[in-house]
Amino acid sequence: MNLIEKGKTDFEFEDERGLICQISHGDIAQVNYVFSKKGAVRGKFHYHKRAKEQFYVISGKLKLEVFKGDTREEYVFTTGNVFLIPPLVRHNFIYLEDTLLVSTYDRCVETGENEKDIFND
């Protein structure tokens, strides 16, 4: 059973000028740019009740730990990888190198004043 979905970019175009990479299209409510230093840990096995997250690794390397119920999984992602974490899947990031990534959400995790779709219970 895979708790997450490994994805790919919608398209990539590269020529002598550089690269265009379409990470996602459609309904995106929130976009985050994240830089984490080697050895950093983020997430603390939080989860979202409603939001679905998609990540694109711009550069670097990270280990993703996920669990739901009795199922636990680990993945390593590097530059160019895309992955999606569905609602209710707990997740934690361990950065194996300095890493840049973009995360998109299908709905905002900040749902109102002092309200968030981020849980650690």
Regions found by a protein language model. Give the residues of each.
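Double-stranded beta-helix
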Residues: N2-E5, D10-D15, I94-D121
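Conserved short histidine dyad/triad with adjacent acidic residue
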Residues: Y33-R50
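ATP/adenylate-binding site constellation spanning eukaryotic-like Ser/Thr protein kinases
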Residues: H25, S59, D98
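A generic "binding-loop/recognition-motif" signal
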Residues: D27, R50, N81, V89, ...
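Short beta-strand His + acidic residue motifs that chelate non-heme Fe in jelly-roll/DSBH
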Residues: I20, K44, L64-E65, I85, ...
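Short acidic-glycine-tyrosine-enriched beta hairpin
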Residues: G69-P87
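A short, N-terminal "cap"/entry segment at the start of jelly-roll beta-barrel domains
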Residues: M1-Q30, K37
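Glycine- and acidic-residue-biased ligand/ion/polar-headgroup-sensing regions
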Residues: R50-K63
